[in-house]
From Swiss-Prot:
Residues the record lists as N6-(pyridoxal phosphate)lysine modifications: 230
Keywords tagged on the record: Amino-acid biosynthesis, Cytoplasm, One-carbon metabolism, Pyridoxal phosphate, Transferase
EC number(s) reported in the record: 2.1.2.1
Gene name as annotated: glyA
Entry cofactors: pyridoxal 5'-phosphate
Native source organism of the sequence: Rickettsia akari (strain Hartford)
Protein name (Swiss-Prot/TrEMBL): Serine hydroxymethyltransferase
Known partners and oligomeric status: Homodimer.
Matching SUPFAM superfamilies: PLP-dependent transferases
Domain of life of the source: Bacteria
Signal peptide start and end residues: none
GO cellular component: cytosol
InterPro entries associated with the record: PyrdxlP-dep_Trfase, PyrdxlP-dep_Trfase_major, PyrdxlP-dep_Trfase_small, Ser_HO-MeTrfase, Ser_HO-MeTrfase-like, Ser_HO-MeTrfase_PLP_BS, SHMT-like_dom
Length: 420
């Protein structure tokens, strides 16, 4: 058998069908998962290229394998482009994920048992910032900060109090569900006060930072981590940035050979393509549209009587607090899914329900903005979401509302392009 003549349809009909059905699903739903986006065909092409065949342990010019001349060029391009994008001196584009980017920082700056201070999960933080089930919560003495009980905004005075009390080796800024801007200047001031390193995880807001729509942490944080998907609209992966090149050298060693073996060169190449796309003028317009769309979505839900956490949003995330409505996040997300609107259940600060149930939902605008949605479209989406939530308040069986909204979703989504 000559494998070079085989295509997916001939080789594996089952996987081929799964991909076809997933493409149909993605094309026909309103995608509101805040951490998802649609990459360009160019990114897909690079990610599915023959670079997947190449093993390239090490770094450009210092590989443990021969034959790396072309993949060296690809990695060098990715590094130079992302350094230009974020205006920084150091970048590592090899992390397989944002989690591994964070782990590389921990391996560089910490010893087991050191104290870290990060945002709690229920306040919008990420697993890798010290949550007890995660290695960051098992290997280190993890202390958590939260948000103000009245405003649901980050309480910087509380962070400072905890930092003075616990003397963390590392202070972490970043979130997976927080709709407001972060004051990186204040974080660095707190870190300096207690002699801590400061790490900014900008996985969700990387696109906003790159385009100047959010304060950049590069001048304040000792090290910055991010994913390359979400608002950067690249392949799934991670990266590490810094203006401290000495820390950068240590991070290189921590990542390889400390955490990973060979980098995924097809992913690195796809990252390079995404970074090039992000350097184009139209990308700034895209990020501005993401934010405008999120504000429109939040306002439309507020007009329908739903509580938006913090009263609005500064970024791409809208958090809906359903506690006063007697609806769980799980029930809402499942009913929306039935109606062709995909989002995720999400904990609300000081949430007393299980993380598998939750009292809220998280909505995001990057994916549908990529498809061309504008403010008026997200106003319509907000009303569709509210129709489903209204139905859940009044009926145990929400089939009627789901069918009505699904018809509207189908009509709207057909107006916007998808992959051929």
């Amino acid at each position: 058998m000559n494998i070079f003549n085989n295509n997916l349809h001939e080789t594996d009909k089952e996987i081929n069908e799964i991909i076809k059905h997933e493409k149909l699903r993605q094309s026909s739903v309103i995608e509101l998962i805040a951490s998802e986006n649609f990459v360009s065909p160019a990114v897909l092409e690079a990610q599915g290229s023959i670079l997947t065949n190449k093993y390239a342990e090490g770094y450009s010019g210092k590989r443990f394998y021969n034959g790396c001349e072309e993949v060296d060029k690809a990695e060098n391009l990715a590094i130079e482009r992302v350094k230009k994008l974020f205006n920084c001196k150091y970048a590592n584009v090899q992390p397989h994920s944002g989690s591994q980017a964070n782990q590389a920082v921990y391996l560089t700056l910490l010893q087991p048992g050191d104290t870290i201070l990060g945002m709690s999960l229920d306040s919008g933080g990420h697993l890798t910032h010290g949550a007890s089930p995660n290695m960051s919560g098992k290997w280190f003495n993890a202390v958590s900060y939260g948000v103000n009980k009245k405003t649901y905004l980050i309480d910087y005075d509380e962070i400072e109090r905890l930092a003075v009390l616990h003397k963390p080796k590392l202070l972490i800024a970043g979130f997976s569900a927080y709709p407001r801007n972060i004051d990186f200047t204040r974080f660095r001031e707190i870190a300096d006060k207690v002699g801590a390193y400061f790490m900014a995880d900008i996985a969700h807001i990387a696109g906003l930072v790159a385009t100047g729509e959010h304060q950049s942490p590069i001048s304040y944080a000792h090290v910055v981590t991010s994913t390359t998907h979400k608002t950067l609209r690249g392949p799934r992966g991670g990266l590490v940035l810094s203006d401290d090149e000495e820390i950068g050298k240590k991070i290189n060693s921590a990542l390889f050979p400390g955490l990973q073996g060979g980098p995924l060169m097809h992913i690195v190449a796809a990252k390079a393509v995404a970074f090039l796309e992000s350097l184009q003028p139209e990308y700034k317009s895209y990020i501005k549209q993401i934010i405008s769309n999120a504000k429109a979505l939040a306002s439309s839900l507020q007009e329908r009587g739903y509580d938006i956490l913090t009263g609005g949003t500064d970024n791409h995330i809208v958090l809906v607090d359903l506690r006063k409505n007697g609806i769980t996040g799980k029930l809402a997300a499942n009913s929306l899914d039935n109606a062709g609107i995909t989002c995720n259940k999400n904990a609300i600060p000081f949430d007393e329900t299980s993380p598998f149930i939750t009292s809220g939902i998280r909505l995001g605008t990057p994916a549908c903005t990529t498809r061309g949605f504008k403010e008026q479209d997200f106003v319509s989406v907000g009303h569709m979401v509210a129709d489903i939530l209204d139905g859940l308040k009044n009926n145990k069986d929400n089939t009627k509302a789901e069918q009505q909204v699904l018809h509207k979703v189908t009509k709207l989504i057909k107006l916007f392009p998808f992959y051929d």
